[in-house]
């Protein structure tokens, strides 16, 4: 049986969730990821993933119609999984379903409209009138009214479950690969030029809703000379945050995007993983995938009480108020002053991840849904 996973844009981090589902199913089924690529390339961290990826050109309307036709013609699967409530994934999947009667599983891991709604009035108006963009607001807004046409729906947090219903499947991780016992923290620190340093890590692309500004403000308040902020997977936009720092600029180390399979190596260098999410429409309907990376690697995690984060951590992390850089700085200091407590929280977080959020969990749930769809045909 062949499973085709549609990704709305292969060139950005939306490929992360699509890749996760593909890896969960690859041991049981023939799996392929397909979709358009806005930049023409594959998102770097998953460029070498051991799953076939078929990429198509991204164009503006009306020229994108030819891409849609090509994708629909090329799909030769028994089951479609559409990642994200987007027209270039779910929309295309529905057209293929109506043409060929192929069952569609809709995977929703973000509230897509939340990313559009955080702007002001005129920003919303401008985005809503952007009809030439295949992934634009008008078509994304329309997709919410078509969720009932999916044969099955899975969601990544309770906000989305309350809004769209469906089965709740959190981001999961392969805890056998993300295993701290397989990595040497000191040697990785030495490799990064951080020998004898205490490291606070931020994973992923810096964005305002991720609390990047609060993290830099917190670093300004920390006077301990051996503490460093290591940003892994950052792009060029991070430089403006560094330039705006009043002090401690020399304590910030930036690593560009890394391949997904190297993530455990870099994460092993962290003493603390910081995920200071803000409370915005961007974050209310999502749960950060890096939360599960940190849990799997038994890292002490500082984060905020947004979305399902407290439930996922189960008390095995450090929760602060969103937007509070003072509290973030104090919590960093507290963790370094209480290493044994932090170590135990990290270990318990890993145990929780192994029990509830291992890749086998998502494999079992997806396989169950696929069997139901194929036996009812």
Q: What residues fall within each predicted segment?
A:
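Nucleotide-activated donor-binding/catalytic signature segment of Leloir-type glycosyltransferases, i.e.
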Residues: 240-264
């Amino acid at each position: 049986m062949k499973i085709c996973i549609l990704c709305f844009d292969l060139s950005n981090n939306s490929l992360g969730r699509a890749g996760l589902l593909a890896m969960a199913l690859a041991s049981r089924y023939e799996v392929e990821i397909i979709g358009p690529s806005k930049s023409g390339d594959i998102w770097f961290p998953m460029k070498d993933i051991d799953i076939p990826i078929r990429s198509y050109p991204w164009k503006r309307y009306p020229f994108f119609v030819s891409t849609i036709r090509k994708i629909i013609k090329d799909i030769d699967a028994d089951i479609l999984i559409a990642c994200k409530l987007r027209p270039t994934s779910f929309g295309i999947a529905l057209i293929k379903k109506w043409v060929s009667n192929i069952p569609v599983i809709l995977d929703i891991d973000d509230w897509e409209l939340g990313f559009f709604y955080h702007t002001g009035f005129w920003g919303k108006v401008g985005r809503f009138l952007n009809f030439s963009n295949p992934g634009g607001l008008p078509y994304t807004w329309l997709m919410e009214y078509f969720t009932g046409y999916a044969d099955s729906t899975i969601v990544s947090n309770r906000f989305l479950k309350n809004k769209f219903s469906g089965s709740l499947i959190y981001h999961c991780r392969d805890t056998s690969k993300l295993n701290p016992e397989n990595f040497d923290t000191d040697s990785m620190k030495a490799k990064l030029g951080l020998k004898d340093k205490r490291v606070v890590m931020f994973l992923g692309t810096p964005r305002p809703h991720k609390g990047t500004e609060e993290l830099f403000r917190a670093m300004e308040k920390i006077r301990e000379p051996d503490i460093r902020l290591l940003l892994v997977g950052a792009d060029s936009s991070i430089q403006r945050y560094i330039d705006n720092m009043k002090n401690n600029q020399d304590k910030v180390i930036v690593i560009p995007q890394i391949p997904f399979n190297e993530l455990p190596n870099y994460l092993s260098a962290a003493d603390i993983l910081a995920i200071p999410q803000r409370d915005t429409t961007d974050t209310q309907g999502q749960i950060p995938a890096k939360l599960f990376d940190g849990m799997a690697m038994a890292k002490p995690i500082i984060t905020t009480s947004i979305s399902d984060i407290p439930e996922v951590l189960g008390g095995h992390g450090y929760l602060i108020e969103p937007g509070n850089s003072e509290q973030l700085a104090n919590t960093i200091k507290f963790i370094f002053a209480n290493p044994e407590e932090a170590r135990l929280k990290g270990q318990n977080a890993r145990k929780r991840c192994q029990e509830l959020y291992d890749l086998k969990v998502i494999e079992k749930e997806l396989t169950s849904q696929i069997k139901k769809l194929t036996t009812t045909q």
